[in-house]
Amino acid sequence: MTQCSAFSGIFFRNWIFIRGVPTIQFLPPEGPPEIAFAGRSNVGKSSLINALVQQKGLARTSNTPGRTQELNYFVPDGFSGSKEDFPPMALVDMPGYGFAQAPKNLVDAWTHLVFNYLRGRTTLKRVYILIDSRHGIKKNDEEVLDLLDKAAVSYQIILTKSDKIKSNMLENLMTTTQMSLLKRPAAYPELLTTSAEKALGLEELRTAILQAVVQ
């Protein structure tokens, strides 16, 4: 049995919220592999996490930009958290970036938290950067990708809400996005497309996460 197949049922267990991290000082001790989800505000991070583990209310969703102000940690239930009984992975819902209506002091605080987490977390196996299929990569996304490249943190692009645009437009977006990633050293070459609402691309995402965790 491969390591991936050993973990294959992990997404269908009960998952729980274990910690919100408002500042870098509140990060939990490094333990299980971490998979983080980042993206512009309201790109669908929380909805995708909920769909990924089939728990509708696990990660909070909101129509208010910047509602997720902390790093939110989720793990499968049933593990004590001791060194002998770590969960096989943790999912991290990161604060949205690119919000225009939030006060500057909050924006600065969230930016400091996110950037310092990305730079210094050795158990962080991969960051999934969520891009709204209707809008493509924006300037704020480019800035985060620059940071990840500089920090040599592996990341992969997910085009979310893929059901909201025509298939030919999605194909064109995938082509242009893949071309733009060729010059980025930390980018994983394969794109993923998902729709949390229609449950599209979730199995492919689960497989990609398991591969990242066991590498």
UniProtKB/Swiss-Prot annotation:
Q: Where along this sequence does the record place binding of GTP?
A: 39-46, 66-70, 93-96, 160-163, 194-196
An annotated GO BP: division septum assembly
Query: CDD domains under this entry?
Result: YihA_EngB
Print the keywords alphabetically: Cell cycle, Cell division, GTP-binding, Magnesium, Metal-binding, Nucleotide-binding, Septation
Which cofactor is essential here? Mg(2+)
- Presence of the UniProt keyword RNA-binding in the record: no
Question: What Pfam families does the record tag this protein with?
Answer: MMR_HSR1 (PF01926)
Q: Which Gene3D superfamilies match?
A: P-loop containing nucleotide triphosphate hydrolases
The record's listing under PROSITE patterns reads: G_ENGB
Gene Ontology MF terms in the entry: GTP binding; metal ion binding
Against InterPro entries, the record matches this protein to: G_ENGB_dom (IPR030393), GTP-bd (IPR006073), GTP-bd_ribosome_bio_YsxC (IPR019987), P-loop_NTPase (IPR027417)
Q: Which residues bind Mg(2+)?
A: S46, T68
The record's function comment reads: Necessary for normal cell division and for the maintenance of normal septation.
Which family, according to the similarity comment? Answer: Belongs to the TRAFAC class TrmE-Era-EngA-EngB-Septin-like GTPase superfamily. EngB GTPase family.
State the protein's name.
Answer: Probable GTP-binding protein EngB
What is the gene called?
Answer: engB
